[in-house]
Amino acid sequence: MGVGIVSYGVYIPRYRIKVDEIARVWGEVEDIARGLNVYEKAVPDLDEDTATIAVEAARNAISRANIDPHRIGAIYTGSESHPYAVKPTGTIVGEAIGCSHSHTVADMEFACKAGTAALQACMGLVRSGMIDLGLAIGADVSQGAPGDALEYTAAAGGAAYVVGAADLIAEIEGTYSFTTDTPDFWRREGIPYPEHGGRFTGEPAYFKHVMSAARGLMELLGKKPEDYDYAVFHQPNGKFPVRVAAKLGFTKEQIAPGLVVPHIGNTYSGSTLIGLAATLDQAEPGESIFVTSFGSGAGSDAFSIRVTERINDIRDRAPGVRDYIAIAEYIDYARYAKHKGKLRL
């Protein structure tokens, strides 16, 4: 049974803060944005969180393909910033989009790859015949401590994917995962901001896992980078995905459509899935997309995706990634700190 993407949707908050504005407050060098290849990032409104972002992305996915929500048999929401420690985000999504009560829900966590883990879980349930459609979501309102390196990129946004076996806009030809116990990034319960290993998050974490998963999938399928029209890699900044693509043999032209981090920052669980959505926004029938996520802790999920003729029927029925990027409203650090709850008494 072929399994793949029936529809997709994204949501990116309209508020933005320039990386240079953050650097100004902390007295950092002026070229930090160029060094990161991230120039601004998305900031949630005062009433936005992972749940509201997930709902908006899911609504866009439902409306794009005119899907009956009652057909959805599973909702898996991946995030590292769920609004409740004990209360599922997915139940909020299900109620908001009008699902029947005959569906299973679980919230997933695996740092920035929780969304692709949700996608794999939906694939398994659909392929087994247990459900008709699954809804996989990756969304975050990520946090970085004031003055920490993470603050320049930690952003907000999310993407939702409806997974099924019929009416596919893109078939998932295969998936492969690579996982180890690598403590490059962590946050204990009750601690407001995560800690990280600095440069340790690069070679032994991001690059090792992304490259291992990517090479594993290409070996499994007997494919090479030149067999793909596009490639999407997790985007913690604008440098890592460009570098890992080159190491694997992909070109800058292949990754350009999905490289959105310079404009919206690192949306964590939404990062890879928003990059995929940006690519689907312009991919043509018959073209192939290679996707690899990364989550600290650490692991990567790789996917080989082939776009079908149906993409042209539904693509323009909901806002695309570039539509959200275009409606930016800029704020200063004081308002940003208020929006992010950084002012604590």
From Swiss-Prot:
Q: Which residues are recorded as binding CoA?
A: R199, K239
Q: Which organism is it from?
A: Methanothrix thermoacetophila (strain DSM 6194 / JCM 14653 / NBRC 101360 / PT) (Methanosaeta thermophila)
In short, the EC number is 2.3.3.10
Reactions it catalyzes: acetoacetyl-CoA + acetyl-CoA + H2O = (3S)-3-hydroxy-3-methylglutaryl-CoA + CoA + H(+)
Q: Which InterPro entries match?
A: ACP_syn_III_C (IPR013747), HMG_CoA_Synthase (IPR004656), Thiolase-like (IPR016039)
Biological process, per Gene Ontology: farnesyl diphosphate biosynthetic process, mevalonate pathway; isopentenyl diphosphate biosynthetic process, mevalonate pathway
Domain of life of the native organism: Archaea
Name it.
Hydroxymethylglutaryl-CoA synthase
